[in-house]
């Protein structure tokens, strides 16, 4: 089994942030995502770019997206 790497271990200058198509322009919460070649993903808030972002490795991000798509009750309001 390979050693788990830290998904935060990227140069922030190399991050290209993309705004979610589900984020509106109405001054609400806007989610931005940066994807890296190895599958890591960072998630941030474009209204507060200096706040810490979340980092997921490829397996974590895949599990998160699958849970959202399956309407997992842990992620529904």
Protein language model features and the residues they cover:
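Negatively charged, low-complexity tracts enriched in Asp/Glu with abundant Ser/Thr
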Residues: 1-18
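A short, structured beta-strand/loop element
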Residues: 20-59, 63-66, 77
């Amino acid at each position: 089994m390979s050693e788990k790497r830290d998904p935060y271990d990227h140069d922030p200058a190399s991050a290209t942030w993309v705004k979610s198509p589900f984020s509106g322009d109405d001054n609400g919460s806007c989610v931005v995502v940066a994807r890296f070649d190895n599958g890591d993903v960072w998630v941030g808030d474009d209204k507060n770019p200096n706040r810490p972002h979340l980092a997921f490795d490829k397996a974590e991000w895949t599990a998160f997206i699958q849970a959202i798509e399956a309407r997992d009750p842990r992620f529904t309001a």
